Amino acid sequence: MRINPTTSTSGPGVSALEKKNLGRIAQIIGPVLDVAFPPGKMPNIYNALVVKGRDTAGQEINVTCEVQQLLGNNRVRAVAMSATDGLTRGMEVIDTGAPLSVPVGGATLGRIFNVLGEPVDDLGPVDTRATSPIHRSAPAFIQLDTKLSIFETGIKVVDLLAPYRRGGKIGLFGGAGVGKTVLIMELINNIAKAHGGVSVFGGVGERTREGNDLYMEMKESGVINEENIAESKVALVYGQMNEPPGARMRVGLTALTMAEYFRDVNEQDVLLFIDNIFRFVQAGSEVSALLGRMPSAVGYQPTLSTEMGSLQERITSTKEGSITSIQAVYVPADDLTDPAPATTFAHLDATTVLSRGLAAKGIYPAVDPLDSTSTMLQPQIVGEEHYETAQRVKQTLQRYKELQDIIAILGLDELSEEDRLTVARARKIERFLSQPFFVAEVFTGSPGKYVGLAETIRGFKLILSGELDSLPEQAFYLVGNIDEATAKATNLEMENNLKK
């Protein structure tokens, strides 16, 4: 969905600079430019430079770059944020005197931006009275909110077994077609309804098709309100796979800057989605090589930990509000020891693993209850009742997993009475972990359900206690709280009696 950016004043304000600091392109190597400036007029690191002019065919050129290195001899090396086609040596370069700034605030909701904060959705210009630079330091210790609190999502399997921390970072692992997008959209919907919060989606190195699909699905499910765009619950920032590495490396910071404004100025709870955090590292690796740095382990940039840290440390809770981040993590060749995912893991508070096996069974959300983890699942944080229930649910499911081979070979009848009971309860638990989503209503026809944490715990305690052993397992499939399951069981019984 790469549409030419709508003409907007959101780029660095060139006219206001009266062109006071001009340089000229000295060398072009792919997306990297060397620019010569007059002595004593060197731009700072991270300053935005703008190249304006015409190419040999007479087409207008407008390329924004970011200063990365000061080379000496009055030269700087900058990385381009868009294609460098048509640039020639000797072209005039304007130093904007400040880092890249992007529009922030309510005007960004329901819109799609590129790395420069320019709208790319053909819906006209964006109000740019409020802008913010993409390079900022992380909040000071004194501003941080150190209280550990659960971020309730209303999704049973997440809240019970791998709860999210308010202001924490969650890794989302899953292959293609297991429901990542639907889970992301449901979280965006729930934070808006339950917490009055907003979301920012950063597509980092995304496939253009996937970005387009997400946008269309968001419009279909009402997350983006086409009639009244200001009522939308999400802002989208895309730096697709076809963009130069500079854009892919910085698009995460553009999304984060928009999220920080909602947290610090509007004092809201914000969800920040980054899909995919691995592409951020990959783009950094490309830029590092282009800048001539010596590669580190597995060819990654030597500054890998620093780059990751500078992004992740800005994602946190402050006294004003919180940014809770959900990051899709691609694991190259399924090697968890690869430096990119290994560096990411150090920052995560919880992992949500989506399982193809559960998706194949039709259990959605297909979150793997045994593989998903959270540092919040401790009795002193979530309370004894929640912790005990979660552990017993996991034990039951683990035992069922161990017995599956025996069942496959010998059948259920060969199991002991106790094991048969465990299997029956585990199958009920497995089905009760499924849930109808609000954003899937348009596809499934069944109304979505938000289940509070207390209701979730009560439901699983009842299943584990054996009080519901007499109910059929299909009564627990795709329902909200436990009362709906018992009502569904009664309906099923009545239907069966009528058939007889």
From Swiss-Prot:
<dbReference type="InterPro" id="IPR003593">
    <property type="entry name" value="AAA+_ATPase"/>
</dbReference>
<dbReference type="InterPro" id="IPR036121">
    <property type="entry name" value="ATPase_F1/V1/A1_a/bsu_N_sf"/>
</dbReference>
<keyword id="KW-0375">Hydrogen ion transport</keyword>
<dbReference type="InterPro" id="IPR024034">
    <property type="entry name" value="ATPase_F1/V1_b/a_C"/>
</dbReference>
<dbReference type="GO" id="GO:0045259">
    <property type="term" value="C:proton-transporting ATP synthase complex"/>
</dbReference>
<keyword id="KW-0547">Nucleotide-binding</keyword>
<dbReference type="InterPro" id="IPR020003">
    <property type="entry name" value="ATPase_a/bsu_AS"/>
</dbReference>
<dbReference type="InterPro" id="IPR050053">
    <property type="entry name" value="ATPase_alpha/beta_chains"/>
</dbReference>
<keyword id="KW-0150">Chloroplast</keyword>
<keyword id="KW-0406">Ion transport</keyword>
<dbReference type="InterPro" id="IPR004100">
    <property type="entry name" value="ATPase_F1/V1/A1_a/bsu_N"/>
</dbReference>
<dbReference type="InterPro" id="IPR000194">
    <property type="entry name" value="ATPase_F1/V1/A1_a/bsu_nucl-bd"/>
</dbReference>
<dbReference type="GO" id="GO:0009535">
    <property type="term" value="C:chloroplast thylakoid membrane"/>
</dbReference>
<keyword id="KW-0067">ATP-binding</keyword>
<dbReference type="GO" id="GO:0005524">
    <property type="term" value="F:ATP binding"/>
</dbReference>
<dbReference type="GO" id="GO:0046933">
    <property type="term" value="F:proton-transporting ATP synthase activity, rotational mechanism"/>
</dbReference>
<comment type="similarity">
    <text>Belongs to the ATPase alpha/beta chains family.</text>
</comment>
<keyword id="KW-0139">CF(1)</keyword>
<dbReference type="Pfam" id="PF22919">
    <property type="entry name" value="ATP-synt_VA_C"/>
</dbReference>
<feature type="binding site">
    <location>
        <begin position="174"/>
        <end position="181"/>
    </location>
    <ligand>
        <name>ATP</name>
    </ligand>
</feature>
<keyword id="KW-0793">Thylakoid</keyword>
<comment type="subunit">
    <text>F-type ATPases have 2 components, CF(1) - the catalytic core - and CF(0) - the membrane proton channel. CF(1) has five subunits: alpha(3), beta(3), gamma(1), delta(1), epsilon(1). CF(0) has four main subunits: a(1), b(1), b'(1) and c(9-12).</text>
</comment>
<dbReference type="GO" id="GO:0016887">
    <property type="term" value="F:ATP hydrolysis activity"/>
</dbReference>
<comment type="function">
    <text>Produces ATP from ADP in the presence of a proton gradient across the membrane. The catalytic sites are hosted primarily by the beta subunits.</text>
</comment>
<keyword id="KW-0813">Transport</keyword>
<protein>
    <recommendedName>
        <fullName>ATP synthase subunit beta, chloroplastic</fullName>
        <ecNumber>7.1.2.2</ecNumber>
    </recommendedName>
</protein>
<dbReference type="InterPro" id="IPR005722">
    <property type="entry name" value="ATP_synth_F1_bsu"/>
</dbReference>
<keyword id="KW-0934">Plastid</keyword>
<keyword id="KW-1278">Translocase</keyword>
<keyword id="KW-0472">Membrane</keyword>
<dbReference type="InterPro" id="IPR055190">
    <property type="entry name" value="ATP-synt_VA_C"/>
</dbReference>
<dbReference type="InterPro" id="IPR027417">
    <property type="entry name" value="P-loop_NTPase"/>
</dbReference>
<keyword id="KW-0066">ATP synthesis</keyword>
<dbReference type="Pfam" id="PF00006">
    <property type="entry name" value="ATP-synt_ab"/>
</dbReference>
<dbReference type="Pfam" id="PF02874">
    <property type="entry name" value="ATP-synt_ab_N"/>
</dbReference>
